Amino acid sequence: MTLRAGVLAVQGDVSEHGDAIERAAAAHDRTAEVVEIREAGLVPDCDVLLLPGGESTTISRLIHREGIAEEIESHVEAGKPVLATCAGLIVSATDAQDDRVDTLNVIDVSVERNAFGRQRDSFEAPLDVTGLNESFPAVFIRAPVIDYVGEDVEVLATWDDRPVAVRDGPVVGTSFHPELTEDPRIHDLAFFDSVES
């Protein structure tokens, strides 16, 4: 069975995300058809969505202008899986602590943009993630910090005593970039019922 995976592509190169989704699907003996979402009308036909990193104010502006935001919200309301990474997490939050970001309100968290530092402060760290048997090599680049978690949100991983991966219903959000590793387990966690390590 082919998994139709939408990757929000309104800003920047998203090829790593497509590769990561294909690796995750292959781990489950499935294939993935990756659809780059740049305009309205494509999200309703997707089984899963990936909201990638980038610049959150730009992403927010473009998805609302293009009519994609409402489709993402409907996707979540239908219980379909979403993985939101870095800026995708910011845009998905209930509070981005920045009036320039019109959030989707699909993850009940408050996030602070770039709180782990600027580009030069990027780092990789092994994370213990709920549901994974071994640590995950998380890559943090201008990463946001989650500083409030709603009562129905499950914290999946922390770094320096701060949440960096969460699940709110069908949506998994990460402060880090799982697509920058060869390890598909975060995508497994977000998109499939079982996780293989």
UniProtKB/Swiss-Prot annotation:
EC number per UniProt: 4.3.3.6, 3.5.1.2
InterPro entries, per the entry: Class_I_gatase-like (IPR029062), PdxT/SNO (IPR002161), PdxT/SNO_CS (IPR021196)
UniProt xrefs under Gene3D superfamilies: 3.40.50.880
Catalytic activity: aldehydo-D-ribose 5-phosphate + D-glyceraldehyde 3-phosphate + L-glutamine = pyridoxal 5'-phosphate + L-glutamate + phosphate + 3 H2O + H(+); L-glutamine + H2O = L-glutamate + NH4(+)
Active site annotation, chain numbering: 86 (nucleophile), 177 (charge relay system), 179 (charge relay system)
GO biological process, one term: glutamine catabolic process
Similarity-based family: Belongs to the glutaminase PdxT/SNO family.
UniProt protein name: Pyridoxal 5'-phosphate synthase subunit PdxT
